[in-house]
Amino acid sequence: NFNDRIYFGLTVGAYALDYSKYCFYDENYGGGEGYNLQTWSKINGAGFDVKLGAIVRPFEYSPLRIGFSVHTPVFYSLDYKTNARLESDVWNDLNVTNEVGTPSNEIGHYDEDTYDILNGDMVSKFQLRTPWTYNLSLGYTVGNNLALGAEYEYKDYSSIQFRDDAGYADSFDYENSTTDMLKGVSTIRLGAEYKVIPQFALRAGYNYQSSIFKDDAFKNLPLNSIQTDTDFVNSESLSNYTLGIGYRGSMFYADLAYKYTTYD
């Protein structure tokens, strides 16, 4: 704090990640035939980042505040485990005869499990670096009742990078090539809070985020992929509208908010 006009801040963040996903995909062709594919995935790891920021009051007797901040990428070290099981029920070849010498027309059940084939999970250890974040904000208060805020944030998602456990990117050429489909994202946040009485406030906000994907982006799965779940949507801009109320007492506080989201 310099003369109550310039404020500097620094934060070191530590993150723990524990993510699990199970997917079941099934096709039924009628007559008893069909197949299903099950996948199990798990990611564990930890990461860290550093945030630097400053708030400036350019005019001594004005409530105007200008904020700047820079967030380093989050540097993750992650362990990825996955396995899959494929089951199918199909009619046996009619040219195959059964034990009494007549053509077999029974449905046969077949299954393969990567855990059994590989004697364990498929395991990958890697490092992930997220984008840098740049932030500019403005704040202003009108009297003792109204507070206004505006914020702009930018992240370039095409700078995301995967590396192997030794820190080399060569073994992750496929994963890193997917970042060519990503682009910089701008986020704008606007907000207002009005205190009806000192303990009770009304709030409203708007949030706009441009698309993370390029217009011609698509999910490029390798031919040997075992992932079948739908987890990709090439959406364009995203808008959030919020309304809220808040109560602050000496022994109790409560907040309630409503959010409406639209995207293209």
Q: What do the PLM-derived regions correspond to, one by one?
A:
Residues 1-264:
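Outer-membrane beta-barrel porins/channels
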